[in-house]
Amino acid sequence: MLKKNRLAALLLAPCLCLSLAACSGGNSAATPAPADTEPVETIGGADGPTDILLTEEESDVAYIQDKGTLVVGITNFEPMDYRDASGEWIGFDADMAKAFAESLGVEAEFVEINWDNKVLELDGKNIDCVWNGMTLTDEVKSAMSTGNAYCLNAQVVVVPAGKAADYQTEESLKDLSFAVESGSAGEDEVERLGCSFTPVQTQANALLEVKAGTSDAAIIDLLMAGAMIGEGTSYPDLTYTVKLNSEEYGVGFRKGSDLAEAFNTFWEAAYADGTVMTAAETYGVQESLIKPD
């Protein structure tokens, strides 16, 4: 019925414009909107409300609830998103994504993506959000609507433990060959340093390159380094040395999506009731949490 009303409104618009032009007599008083105009909502993200208005039909929240799933784009990135022994996706981000989906009345579905294609995956509606320890760079914030930052992080240099003493400054890194995840903050850092590097699909693959000796070093997230290298891990002979920067993590949604504001509302409540801290302590990221304003 709404579609018929819209069609009728479009057909009548020229006639109404002529009629109003003839009868206005210079009266500039605002004309009330038609009764069947659909409601709109202002959406916002980490940078505050935007000027974009979404109709009910364009609402991502309504879209998610209608299909019953929140499709989350991820990569294998411990301790944020990774599989347990049974193949289920777990991790701090994965657990919180499930809780967010539950707050919307839907199920979370996880899809591994090529990190370079994350914006294309979002815009093509193959996924509904990117929730994978994503650094809030200017590039990310210009291409997506993002929730408020929730975690602090840094990029660090990973080298064999036996060589760590030789690589304690940025200057000492110049002659090293690096492995970095393509499209990542680590790639940005190695380009800034002017070092040679090999792009790989994931940060986990970058560690494999160093372990195999095909690359001298890797640049990965500090949170991942803390979880995946050193004594008691699969990479006991690797360590990290130089901390290259500091950054913040956030969740990305389609540009103009009302899911960003829904996330902010959810996160504030989940932080207040202890859900966030419980998950953070489970995966050892509690010291990196950013308290909501």
Regions found by a protein language model. Name each.
Residues 48, 95, 110-121, 165, ...:
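Short helix-initiation/N-cap motifs at beta->coil->alpha
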Residues 94-103, 161, 177, 182-184, ...:
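Extended ligand-binding regions for polar small-molecule ligands
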Residues 58-133:
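Extracytoplasmic small-molecule ligand-binding "clamshell" domains
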Residues 24-27:
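Bacterial signal peptide processing site
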Residues 147, 159-178:
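Flexible hinge/capping segments at coil-to-helix
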Residues 152-159, 222, 226-268, 286-293:
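Periplasmic-binding protein-like
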Residues 18-22:
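C-terminal motif of bacterial Sec signal peptides marking the signal peptidase cleavage site
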Residues 102-103, 111-112, 116-129, 143-145, ...:
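Short helices/loops that flank or line small-molecule/ion binding pockets
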